[in-house]
A protein has these predicted regions:
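C-terminal transmembrane helical hairpin of 12-TM major facilitator-type secondary transporters
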Residues: 282-286, 292, 299-350
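Helix-to-loop junctions at the C-terminal end of transmembrane segments
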Residues: 75-88, 290-301, 386
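Extracytoplasmic
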Residues: 23-58, 76-79, 165, 257-263
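Intracellular juxtamembrane helix-capping segments at the cytosolic ends
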Residues: 50, 128-142, 342-355
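Helix-loop-helix hairpin linking two adjacent transmembrane segments in secondary transporters
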Residues: 157-204
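Extracytoplasmic gate region of multi-pass secondary transporters
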Residues: 43-47, 236-288
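Cytoplasmic helix-loop-helix junction between adjacent transmembrane helices
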Residues: 120-155
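C-terminal ends and interior cores of transmembrane alpha-helices
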Residues: 97-110, 312-324
Length: 423
């Protein structure tokens, strides 16, 4: 009698450089670079240019940015379902189309309502290319090397701050806002569409459970064993799940708040040019931190790594508030950046290690959504505290308190039993 084992493919060698999953990782790197480049690091550029062109208030434009973050968070919750129903290639192509359309349309808006509409389109694109989508897609190709693949792919997020945003600034100065935005969207489409079409294919057949359901319609590992064993409601009612989602939501609120206010805080002390260089240094160090985590992942206690990362960021922020010395500020930004990228990667890595495998995709999407819902309010909250107190001391003290609380929570709430079954 024929058994399922008769149809199983040979064991997948994820360590081989020829393994197709590494090409998928490269595509995810570029996806992350454009997603974060246009969807996070360039929002300050959009704000400055729209104010220059139309004289719109900061609160009006910031309101559109907050709406963008909140809608993205709402959609990320369901990204694992979208990948199952549509497949990774279609999801990434949909994201590229929406993000590219939004970047292009920003060049032609003339009214505030159009800005909000464009940001809603951008949110759809961002959700389909964000960390939840990338970790779910990589979960289809990787099991043992999933942590390394995620760390490598999400280095693209930091690269968006190093390459995409600065290039956009130069292009706007040379050609104007409209031409630069259309050109940037064209370049993104020219790179991503063929790369996704050629290299994002069906994942390999596996005899083991990877924790991410394969797309429907293909003869892949989409058996009943890969259906999530718990629901989103059960996850939200679980203290074990919140021991991951809660601390990282607080940590990212502080981190994203600092990102948005970094130049405004540093410019009076070291000038605009050097303040801009601290952004490049921070994002470069984020890449170094991710690579270091990726190569040593299997030997590390990830919750302890998270706690130490948050303590180092808190110390860096404290140092920044106590000096105007340029060298000290650069060193503090480098220390802060060393952990910045890992705080995006670590939730998925902890979930993979601690929770039952079949719920990986759903739990990562839900955790990502909670984090984004929370950090959407970070920049505004810091702005309110700064305006109320007349400086950034109290605002950064709030960030430090959030980071210390997150460090304590993630370390003290570690589960006793693994893998965790939430049902």
């Amino acid at each position: 009698m024929t058994t399922p084992a008769d149809f199983a493919s040979p064991a997948v060698d994820e360590s081989s450089p020829r393994y197709d999953g590494w090409r998928v990782t490269a595509v995810c790197f570029v996806v992350a670079m454009f997603c974060w480049g246009f969807g996070l690091y360039s929002h300050g550029i959009y704000l400055a240019e729209l104010q220059r062109l139309f004289g719109w208030s900061t609160s009006l434009i910031s309101g559109a940015t907050t709406a963008y973050y909140l809608l993205t968070a709402s959609l990320v919750v369901f990204i694992s379902d979208a990948i199952v129903q549509l497949g990774p290639r279609r999801v990434f192509l949909l994201g590229t189309c929406c993000l590219g359309s939004a970047v292009t349309l920003l060049a032609f808006i003339v009214a505030p309502w159009q800005l909000y509409l464009v940001y809603l389109i951008m949110a759809v694109g961002s959700a389909a290319m964000h960390v939840g989508a990338i970790t779910n897609v990589l979960g289809l190709w990787f099991d043992r090397r999933r942590g390394l693949a995620i760390s490598l792919a999400l280095n693209g997020a930091s690269s968006g701050g190093i390459f995409v945003a600065p290039t956009l600034i130069v292009a706007i100065a040379e050609t104007g806002f409209a031409a630069a935005m259309v050109g940037a969207a064209t370049v993104m489409a020219a790179i991503l569409v063929p790369a996704i079409t050629i290299w994002i294919d069906q994942p390999p057949i596996r005899t083991e459970t990877t924790g991410v359901s394969a797309p429907q319609g293909g003869s892949r590992s989409g058996s009943a064993s890969t259906v999530p064993r718990c629901t989103r409601l059960e996850a939200l009612q679980s203290l074990a799940f919140w021991s991951v989602a809660g601390p990282f939501a607080l940590a990212l609120m502080a981190q994203v708040g600092f990102f948005v206010h970094q130049i405004a805080f540093l410019e009076p002390a070291i000038g605009r040019t050097q303040a801009g260089l601290t952004v490049a240094l921070l994002t470069a160090m984020a890449i170094v931190g991710r690579l270091a985590l990726g190569v040593s992942l299997l030997r590390l206690d990830l919750r302890r790594v998270t706690a130490l990362s948050l303590l180092s960021q808190a110390a860096a922020l404290l140092a920044m508030t106590q000096t105007t010395n340029a060298a000290v500020l650069f060193v503090a930004c480098a220390i802060f950046g060393l952990s910045a990228g890992n705080l995006v990667s670590l939730p998925a890595l902890i979930i993979q290690r601690e929770f039952e495998a079949t719920s990986f995709g759903m739990l990562v999407g839900l955790s990502t959504a909670i984090g984004q819902f929370t950090y959407a309010f970070g920049p505004g909250l810091l702005g309110v505290v700064r305006d109320a107190t007349g400086g950034y001391g109290a605002a950064f003290a709030l960030c430090i308190m959030l980071q210390l609380a997150a460090a304590g929570a993630v370390q003290m709430s570690r589960p006793q039993r693994k893998p965790i079954d939430l049902r």
